[in-house]
Each structure stands twice: as structure tokens, then as C-alpha cells.
């Protein structure tokens, strides 16, 4: 059963700490297997991808068949109904518009010592996006990962997506087309991550890998980090709803279950100061669980990981929220803007009764790739910035070096780095321009 806590009870502190520290991810030790897969891909290249694809996805490939051809893409994309096509185009346009506003400016100035300083932003050259496969794969995730990369100016974007039994969701391919993806490969699992990181005869290596995946994909991303950049190791999805007496319990129940239906390890938490909201939401959840198409998953998630916390006021609610640092935070209250100003830890905030988290998964514009497992305390969601590098710039004249150089020489000598100091002092003593 879900956890029911009251912040006024004597054992609340202990119970809340247990809620925060509860482990929701499957503890599958796959590191050894993944290390072997990566090693074989490095050693055998395309052949390893072909062998693993036959083993796991039950399809026979050749090096020429690893990549989708233009005609194959066109054939699959034609299968997308007009309603879904229009919805995906709307989502893509809104995501692109939002992320264009994230592009930072370069800067250059001269300080009081005559030193010219600045920074310059430039995109990474190539990025790889992992897309979970099968007919149940999510085209929205393609948009959320690929569009920021293209907006940033990434010149080459490759996607790997497994096609078990040679099946693919056409919406995924349309999303890739709308996002400006350059290459799409029929490869999945840890072997796809290895191919993107180290390259094969067919797949060129990339500089950064993003995208969700199972335990094998997550382990592979950890192991190739350093060779390439990665976005994050995302855990199970989560939502926290802060609700007062003005909220709609029937809506809140659906919002909580919208996360619970993701997977059995997802977490949904409600914090409220209203006893009526507590009672009504509990009832509405039970009613909805009887009718959902994914009721088995949602019920297990809610029973194993769900929580309702009763608080005396929203000062306590905000304190608890900032400690939870949720991936998604809904403020279903009368004055959400006032509350939002006090929130310091959250991946994304959804303000007001008319802003369900689910709409943010698709069409509002902000990215839905967000920090989980309390990592919103120190990290942010995926953005254009994840595909940019900042290079600092500095230029000194002789006069500028004479002004600040002596301090640098002093510091170099204090650190015992003689040649550092000499490289500066020799210039200061020179009369050449």
C-alpha cells in the first residue's frame, strides 16, 4: 500500500527519511556483461552489432542493412496517420521555439588593466541519441533529445533504435525526420552505445550520447563516459503534487497515476494541507485503477512507491518539496506563482490547475528529459547547453602583461613552478613588440 504520512506525528522525521532513501531501481548487476559487449564491439565492429542484433532482436542484418535507407524511411513515415502527424509537428515546432531561446551569447570586453577577455560558444561536432525500440518506443523522446542538439548547431546527429522482429514505430522515424536527424541505425542495447562511442566500419563515433534505456544501456553509458560525454543516468519517473483546497481531486488522482503508469518503479507523491483532498484523492485513485489499460503497472507503482503527506501549511510543504527535489513538480494551488518563487529544487515546475505534467511531456516546449532520484538538487534537464562548449578567450598587450604579470610570477614561484614564472618574466623584460 502507498505510504500515508502526517508531518505533525512524532515519527514523521524517520518515516520521511525512509521515503527519501527508498531504492526504486532494479538492482541488476550488468556491468560485467556490458564490459564484454563493449569489448567485442571495439574488437569486431559491425560484425559484433550484427551478431548481437540476431541474438536479441531476432533479425538478420548485413553491414549495408544496419542503417535505414531514405526509401525505407519514406515508406515507414507514410504509415503515420494525419492526426498523429499533425500532433508531432506541433510538438516539434514548440520544442524548437522554446530551445532557440536558450542559445547563449558570446562575450568579449577589455578590463581596467587593458586585458581583452571573453568567451565563445560552439556546438559539439557529433551527437548520438539512443531510442528504446519496438512498437512502444516514444517519439516524444526523440524530439526532446534531438531538437536541442540541432538548435545548438550539432552538424551530425545519429540515432540508434532496436527493431525487434524487424518492427519499428513509424512515429519514431517521423520524429527523427522532423528533428533533422542525419543517420538512423537498427541497433540497440549496450552494443549501440559502444558503437556510438568507439565507432565501427559503418557507424562513425560521436562526441556525446543522450537518451534513455534499460539497465544495460545505462551501464554502457557509465562505462563509455570519458571517451564521450553523456547526458545523465535517468532513474524511474517521479511526480510531486502540492495541492490545496482549491484543487480538483479527480484531476490530481489522474496526474499521480500518469507517472505511475510509466513503470512499476515510478513514484507519485501528494503533499496537501487539506484532509478532504487526502480522502478524495485516495478514492479517485482506486476508482481509476480499475479502468486503466495499464492498471497492473500503475497499481504496483502506486502501492509500492506512492505517498500522501498531510502538512499543517505550505511552509512545511515547500520545505519537504525542496528536500524531495522531484523530477516533476505540480503546484495545484490558488497562487502557484507565489509558491514557485520558493522552490529551489525541481526538474520542472507546472503552475496552476490547468497545467498537468502530462502536457509537458509532449507539447509545452520545455524538455522532458529531467533529473531524477533527487538529483535536481544539483543538476538540470536536457537543454541546448548540453550540446555546446564554452571556450574562454584572453589577449594581453605588453602593457597589460606588465600590469598583472608580476602577480602571476609571484604565484608561480610560490607553487615551485619555475618555468611558469620564466615564461611570463621573459616577456616582461623584452623590448620587442
Describe the residue ranges of each PLM region.
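A conserved active-site cap/scaffold subdomain adjacent to cofactor or substrate pockets
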Residues: 232-304, 308
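C-terminal core of ALDH-fold dehydrogenases
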Residues: 323-433
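Conserved NAD(P)+-binding/catalytic subdomain of aldehyde/semialdehyde dehydrogenases
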Residues: 180-267
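Conserved small-residue-rich beta-alpha loop and adjacent elements
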Residues: 109-174
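N-terminal Rossmann-like NAD(P)+-binding subdomain of aldehyde/semialdehyde dehydrogenases
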Residues: 1-125
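Flexible, glycine/charged-enriched surface loops at secondary-structure junctions
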Residues: 104-109, 229, 266-271, 291-302, ...
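Short acidic-hydrophobic, aromatic-tinged amphipathic segments that line or gate anion-handling sites
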Residues: 3-8, 183-188, 308-313
Amino acid at each position: 500500500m502507498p505510504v500515508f504520512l502526517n508531518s505533525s506525528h512524532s515519527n514523521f522525521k524517520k518515516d520521511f527519511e525512509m521515503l527519501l532513501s527508498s531504492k526504486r531501481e532494479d538492482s541488476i548487476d550488468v556491468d560485467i556483461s556490458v564490459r564484454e559487449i563493449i569489448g567485442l564491439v571495439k574488437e569486431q565492429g559491425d560484425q559484433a552489432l550484427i551478431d548481437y542484433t540476431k541474438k536479441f532482436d531476432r533479425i538478420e542484418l548485413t553491414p549495408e542493412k544496419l542503417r535505414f535507407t531514405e526509401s525505407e524511411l519514406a515508406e515507414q513515415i507514410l504509415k503515420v496517420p494525419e492526426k498523429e502527424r499533425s500532433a508531432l509537428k506541433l510538438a516539434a515546432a514548440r520544442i524548437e521555439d522554446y530551445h532557440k531561446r536558450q542559445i547563449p551569447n558570446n562575450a568579449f570586453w577589455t578590463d581596467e588593466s587593458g586585458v581583452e577577455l571573453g568567451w565563445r560558444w560552439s556546438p559539439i561536432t557529433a551527437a548520438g541519441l539512443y531510442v528504446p525500440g519496438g512498437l512502444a518506443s516514444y517519439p516524444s523522446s526523440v524530439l526532446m533529445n534531438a531538437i536541442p542538439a540541432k538548435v545548438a548547431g550539432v552538424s551530425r546527429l545519429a540515432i540508434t533504435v532496436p527493431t525487434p522482429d524487424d518492427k519499428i514505430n513509424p512515429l519514431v522515424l517521423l520524429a527523427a525526420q522532423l528533428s533533422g536527424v542525419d543517420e538512423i541505425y537498427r541497433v540497440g542495447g549496450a552494443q549501440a552505445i559502444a558503437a556510438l562511442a568507439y565507432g565501427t566500419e559503418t557507424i562513425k563515433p560521436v562526441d556525446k550520447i543522450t537518451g534513455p534505456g534499460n539497465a544495460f544501456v545505462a551501464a554502457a553509458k557509465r562505462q563509455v563516459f570519458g571517451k564521450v560525454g553523456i547526458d545523465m543516468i535517468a532513474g524511474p519517473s517521479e511526480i510531486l503534487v502540492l495541492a490545496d483546497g482549491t484543487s480538483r481531486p479527480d484531476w490530481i488522482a489522474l496526474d499521480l497515476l500518469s507517472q505511475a503508469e510509466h513503470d512499476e518503479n515510478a513514484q507519485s507523491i501528494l503533499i496537501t494541507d487539506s484532509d478532504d483532498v487526502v480522502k478524495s484523492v485516495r478514492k479517485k485513485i482506486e476508482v481509476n485503477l480499475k479502468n486503466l489499460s495499464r492498471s497492473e503497472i500503475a497499481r504496483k507503482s502506486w502501492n509500492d512507491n506512492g505517498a500522501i503527506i498531510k502538512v499543517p501549511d505550505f511552509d512545511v510543504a515547500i520545505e519537504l518539496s525542496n528536500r524531495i527535489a522531484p523530477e516533476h513538480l505540480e503546484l495545484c494551488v490558488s497562487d502557484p506563482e507565489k509558491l514557485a518563487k520558493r522552490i529551489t529544487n525541481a526538474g520542472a515546475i507546472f503552475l496552476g490547475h490547468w497545467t498537468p505534467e502530462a502536457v509537458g511531456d509532449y507539447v509545452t516546449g520545455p524538455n522532458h528529459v529531467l533529473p531524477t532520484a533527487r538529483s535536481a538538487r544539483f543538476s538540470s534537464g536536457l537543454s541546448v547547453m548540453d550540446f555546446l562548449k564554452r571556450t574562454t578567450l584572453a589577449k594581453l598587450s605588453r602593457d597589460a602583461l606588465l600590469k598583472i604579470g608580476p602577480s602571476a610570477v609571484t604565484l608561480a614561484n610560490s607553487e615551485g613552478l619555475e618555468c611558469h614564472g620564466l615564461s611570463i618574466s621573459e616577456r616582461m623584460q623584452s623590448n620587442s613588440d
